[in-house]
Regions:
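Short, Lys/Arg-enriched N-terminal segments with co-localized hydrophobic residues
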Residues: 1-7
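Acidic/His- and Gly-rich active-site-bordering loop/insert found
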Residues: 9-117, 136-141
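Acidic/histidine-rich catalytic neighborhood of metal-dependent amide-processing enzymes
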Residues: 120-190
Length: 191
């Protein structure tokens, strides 16, 4: 059992290392899409990008809209027992035009910069590559992975709350894939 787990871990690490440049290109593409909170067109463009990637690995996708945003629910079927909900967001706090004014770049220290790159676009792309790596390694020991990319996390909305409540009822486990804080700090509430 442990040997199989070690082989799986090594296969995932190898996949991630081999696809790092692709990851950076996809992060650049997503970061350079203006998708500020309340920008329905921008959040739709960002979630269409995510949907294309998720469809390529075998997921089904469903878009949900309100007057302010586009939300995406992607579902990847497995052969296991448990359903896992992953939640991230494609919206940012930046207004339309910020991506052109301050486009994605990687500095001399290999840090990525751009509107929303750290909250939460890097995570959005990391989840996609993580799922690709698991699939490439042959891992499907889950009933379903539901990947919800929220279009209104920064400002919150009734639509997002309803979607999370609905998907939570369908899931055995949930992981919020938002950005971490220094020294392993976590955000538990907003003031």
């Amino acid at each position: 059992k442990y040997e199989r787990g070690n082989k799986m871990r090594e296969a995932v690490k190898k996949y991630i290392a081999e696809h790092y440049e692709d990851y950076v290109k996809d992060l650049e593409a997503l970061t350079n899409i203006d998708s500020g909170n309340g920008d329905r067109e921008g959040t739709e463009a960002a979630n269409k990008f995510v949907a294309e990637k998720m469809t390529a690995i075998g997921a089904t996708t469903e878009f949900r809209y309100n007057d302010r945003a586009c939300h995406l629910i992607s579902r990847l079927k497995g052969t296991g027992k448990y359903t896992i909900l992953l939640v991230a967001h494609v919206d940012t706090v930046f207004k339309k035009g910020e991506a052109a004014r301050r486009p994605f770049r990687v500095d001399e220290n290999n840090f990525a910069w751009g509107p929303g790159v750290g909250d939460d676009k890097a995570t959005v792309v990391e989840v996609i590559y993580g799922l690709e790596a698991l699939k490439a390694a042959g891992f499907d020991n889950f009933k379903e992975i539901i990947y919800y990319t929220n279009g209104e996390e920064e400002g919150g909305s009734k639509t997002a709350e309803e979607i999370v409540a609905e998907l939570s009822q369908q899931s055995d486990f949930a992981i919020i894939m938002d950005v971490a804080r220094p020294n392993w700090g976590i955000v538990t509430q907003r003031k």
